[in-house]
Amino acid sequence: MTEAFARAKINLTLHVTGQRPDGYHLLDSLVVFADVGDRVRAEPAEALSLAITGPQAANLPVADDNLVLRAARTLGGQGARLTLEKHLPVASGIGGGSADAAAALVALARLWQVPLPDPAAVLKLGADVPVCLEGRAVRMAGVGEILTPLAAPLPEAWLVLANPGVSVPTPPVFKALARRDNPPMPDDLPGWPTVESLAALLATQRNDLEPPAIALAPEIARTRAALAAQPGCLLARMSGSGATCFGLFAAEEAARAAAEAIGTQHPGWWVAPARMVG
């Protein structure tokens, strides 16, 4: 048996800078990961199959177009018994499906002893799959295929992730964008020696999908506000196309206290403290 961890992907920034003739949007995003996520296990079997377990399993029925199965098919026609242990909310803006696909590729490449597919094949699975396969902090551009490592390591930081229990499909959010030619991030991203300096830079940047997502799901604004109100929260913003929002914290204790407080105030929300992985 082989196993791979599918970390949550967090867009600290997400600038929509254009749209190609084929309809794909051009992005400029600072992407990190959180030390919370799903797990994909792969065991030898004659046929390819998928079982979904975990606290979020009921929200993701097994279907032939599941990204885990699609990822498996890109590696060939061999068999395997796959188990997806689902902890991340579905359609939540933190790359759950893409991270699961990337984890499936890693687990199956080990099981079958084959190389990972080429970048073009990975990108066909979804715009976030290449960055999830990379699994470290990068600047993501193009339609998701241009990944540039950061010039300096990110500071130690903690995140609180909160989702109000609302699934937000990505296409309607992009369709509701007011404009698609927004300015990118600065050409040069300096190093950030402290979490405070990182938060200061992030405060000057954006998630261009946040306004249209809030228009479609007003609960996102309340989620962001709940995070921003917590002691020690340096910045609160939506990740991806929503509905998950993140709060940036310098200290583990403050992050854990914030997660507990929000979970108590909003028992129907999904809330998780996590170390930021860069």
Swiss-Prot record:
Question: What sort of enzyme, by top EC class, is this?
Answer: transferase
Q: Which GO terms describe its biological process?
A: isopentenyl diphosphate biosynthetic process, methylerythritol 4-phosphate pathway; terpenoid biosynthetic process
GO molecular-function terms, A-Z: 4-(cytidine 5'-diphospho)-2-C-methyl-D-erythritol kinase activity; ATP binding
Give the transmembrane ranges: none
Q: Where does ATP bind?
A: P89, V90, A91, S92, G93, I94, G95, G96, G97, S98, A99
User: What SUPFAM superfamilies does the annotation carry?
Assistant: GHMP Kinase, C-terminal domain (SSF55060), Ribosomal protein S5 domain 2-like (SSF54211)
- Which positions are catalytic residues? K9, D128
Supply the EC number(s): 2.7.1.148
Q: Which UniProt keywords apply?
A: ATP-binding, Isoprene biosynthesis, Kinase, Nucleotide-binding, Transferase
The entry sums up its family as follows: Belongs to the GHMP kinase family. IspE subfamily.
Q: Which PANTHER family match?
A: 4-DIPHOSPHOCYTIDYL-2-C-METHYL-D-ERYTHRITOL KINASE, CHLOROPLASTIC
Q: Which NCBIfam families match?
A: ispE, PRK14608.1
Functionally, this protein is described as follows: Catalyzes the phosphorylation of the position 2 hydroxy group of 4-diphosphocytidyl-2C-methyl-D-erythritol.
Q: What is this protein called?
A: 4-diphosphocytidyl-2-C-methyl-D-erythritol kinase
From which source organism is this entry?
Cereibacter sphaeroides (strain KD131 / KCTC 12085)
State which gene encodes it. Answer: ispE
